[in-house]
Amino acid sequence: MQRVALVTGANRGLGLEIVTQLARLGLLVVPTARDADSAAAVAHALTASGLQAVPGVLDVTSDASVGALQTAVLGQLGRVDVLVNNAGIGHDFGRPAAGADLALVEDHLRTNLLGSWRVSNAFVEGMVANRYGRIVFLSSGMGALSEMGGGSPGYRVSKAGVNALVRMLAAETAGANVLVNAACPGWVRTDMGGPNATRTVTEGADTAVWLATLEDGGPTGGFFRDRAAIAF
């Protein structure tokens, strides 16, 4: 059976690399983006290379957008087997928590935490019913309590929340062959990471792709960097 993989924020950077690698592994992929033309361009490039892709329009902060995507994808493809929650923002790097702009913190929570939660809610029940699912959250060591420092409060707190959500969903889907994990890609040369970052997008995507294609009985409820477990 060909698996269906949906990747959020797949029009550039890590998301584009992840969706491309999954397509090359033989999955039918759904690259999503807020802009319909951007999502369609990714899908067209993949299909032109002989891969299978269906574009999806998605704003993770909108209930209506997520609901419309859910209806469209399930109506056309029947199910989603793999979900990679990649869409995210990082707009307060280096800013202090003391005196933080709380509206900016809320922006990070709305996209990074609630956005990925909203999309997961749309598809996790189907995964449980089908007795197969892989949910991957793109997180960060900056959200690990074990590594927590100062600065970047919206980004850090939102990713700490993502890590907590991973643990909850993994516990709630235990025994259903739904594996829920977080991936830390490291500091990657993307629009967010900047040109001085130490990793390529290929390196940054590797752990997420590995988690998205885990064999049955693989780990769940974990946090991984370079395919090795790290502390929350």
Summary of predicted features, one role per range:
Residues Q2-V30:
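Canonical Rossmann dinucleotide-binding motif of NAD(H)/NADP(H)-dependent dehydrogenases/reductases
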Residues V84, V119-F123, L165-V166, L211:
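Hydrophobic positions on the long internal alpha-helix
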Residues I89-G90, P96-L109, W117, V128, ...:
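Catalytic loop of short-chain dehydrogenase/reductase
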Residues G175-V178, A182-P185, G194-F232:
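C-terminal helical subdomain
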Residues L25-A41:
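Conserved glycine-rich Rossmann-like NAD(P)H-binding loop of the short-chain dehydrogenase/reductase
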